Design a protein with these regions (language model features):
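Cell-envelope/extracellular polymer assembly enzymes that use nucleotide-activated donors
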Residues: 6-8, 36
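Structural signature of the Rossmann-like NAD(P)-dependent dehydrogenase/reductase core
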Residues: 8, 41-44, 66
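Active-site beta-to-alpha loop of glycosyltransferases that engages the nucleotide-sugar donor
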Residues: 11-25, 43
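Residue-level preference for short helical/loop micro-motifs built around acidic side chains
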Residues: 18-22, 46, 50, 74
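Short, acidic, metal-binding catalytic loop of nucleotide-sugar glycosyltransferases
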Residues: 25-34
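Conserved donor nucleotide-binding strand/loop of the catalytic core
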Residues: 35, 49-82
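A conserved acidic beta->alpha catalytic loop
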Residues: 41-49, 95
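Acceptor/aglycone-binding surface of glycosyltransferases and processive sugar-polymer synthases
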Residues: 68-82, 87-90, 96-128
Length: 128
């Protein structure tokens, strides 16, 4: 029987070909639970897709989800509609620095928190 994902990581992309490889390498080498990465994209010609396919050709953790419309919000909605995991985390394609927060967020989920919203932009926000 196939084990269910504990975590789906949604990454909305739009021309992120310069940053996505580093971001994915960091996630793939850091996250410790059973997870999938859902790449939510607007259009088939987005250079991000080719870069991912060229650098991670046989990685079964990476799933491509085409946006039903266009734009960031619709990409997230498309991603949420495609999730199957217990927990969902939104991660930015150009954030190759804060990948360690993924495990911390998942730990908080396991502790019983239903919404975890880390942000480096919220006044008084901090890494836990």
């Amino acid at each position: 029987m196939k084990e269910k994902n504990q975590l789906d990581i949604l990454i909305p992309v739009f021309n992120e070909d310069e940053t996505i490889v580093k971001t994915l390498k960091n996630i793939l080498s850091t996250v410790s639970c059973n997870y999938k990465i859902l790449i939510c994209y607007d259009y088939d010609e987005d250079p991000t897709l080719k870069i991912i396919k060229d650098n991670f050709p046989y990685n079964l953790k990476i799933i491509f989800v085409k946006n039903f419309s266009y734009g960031f919000n619709n990409a997230l909605i498309s991603g949420f509609k495609s999730t199957t995991a217990e927990a969902v985390l939104i991660f930015m394609a150009d954030d190759h620095i804060n990948h360690d927060v993924i495990n911390l967020c998942y730990e908080k989920f396991i502790e019983g928190y239903q919404v975890i919203c880390p942000s480096r932009f919220i006044k008084g926000g901090k890494m836990i």
